[in-house]
Regions:
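Hydrophobic transmembrane alpha-helices
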Residues: 2-70, 76, 80, 85, 103-112, 200, ...
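Membrane-embedded alpha-helical segments of multi-pass membrane proteins
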Residues: 49-57, 94-102, 145, 194
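Hydrophobic transmembrane alpha-helices of multi-pass small-molecule transporters
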Residues: 55-56, 75, 79-82, 104, ...
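Hydrophobic alpha-helical transmembrane segments
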Residues: 23-27, 68-72, 93-98, 125-133, ...
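Alpha-helical transmembrane segments and their immediate juxtamembrane flanks
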Residues: 3-8, 12, 19, 91-122, ...
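Membrane-embedded alpha-helical hairpins and interfacial helices in multi-pass inner-membrane proteins
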Residues: 38-50, 88, 111-214
């Protein structure tokens, strides 16, 4: 245990009732998810979303229910932004909430074994890779199916252009639309899940270090 030598925001969080601390951490995570997506995708034009880094951190630090709240909240707010700001009235946008829920569930199932995570750095890495593999598989399948219906009933939003380009390439090579939508998700979704999982775990360890002083 590291002694507390000064009083700062982390000390305030530490001394709060657990429920209130969890709510504040979830709100901060929600804001940071939007900032990460805005910086990496919209500003730097990196074809990855990084909008679940802090959701993963919340799952590790606070548990399943707070993680689900952050995930569902992000997709709900994002859907409202598309409707109010961009005039996109597309019900399928909110269906990506399913992907977020699956990411939270797959992360939580493995992250419950927190004691085993710290056996050694190698074990930690293996567990994180396992989470990335499971969550990316869930994301690839669920996002691919949602994209499939997007293509049938709506024009896929511009923010999906990297994946849209891959999908059209597979279609041009005579794959079915459903298979093309799923295959197009593989490279981007796996890279996104791998980076977001490791980054989220890193944020969780920082929370332990600075809030719990462990």
């Amino acid at each position: 245990m590291i002694p507390r030598t000064n009083f700062n925001f982390c000390d305030i969080l530490y001394n709060m009732p657990k429920a209130l601390r969890t709510v504040i951490i979830c709100i901060i995570a929600e804001i940071l998810n939007f900032l990460a997506a805005d910086v990496f995708y919209h500003t730097l034009k990196i074809p990855l979303f990084f909008d679940t880094i802090f959701t993963v951190a919340v799952v590790f630090y606070c548990g399943l229910v707070p993680g689900l709240c952050v995930s569902v909240g992000y997709n709900l707010i994002n859907s409202l932004i598309w409707v109010l700001q961009k005039g996109v009235a597309d019900p399928f946008i909110f269906f990506y909430t399913i992907c977020g829920i699956l990411i939270v569930l797959s992360t939580w199932v493995v992250s419950r074994r927190k004691a085993e995570f710290k056996i050694s750095p190698v074990v930690t890495i293996l567990y994180l890779v396992l989470i990335a593999l499971i969550s990316s598989f869930c994301t690839i399948i669920s996002s691919g199916i949602i994209d499939y219906f997007h293509y049938i009933y709506y024009d896929v939003p511009d923010m999906m252009n990297p994946i849209k380009s891959f999908t059209e390439s597979f279609v041009n090579h005579h794959f079915s639309l459903l298979v093309s939508c799923i295959l197009a998700q593989i490279s981007i979704s796996f890279a996104d899940r791998l980076i977001a999982t490791f980054a989220g775990y890193g944020v969780y360890r920082l929370c332990e270090r600075f809030i719990e002083r462990r």
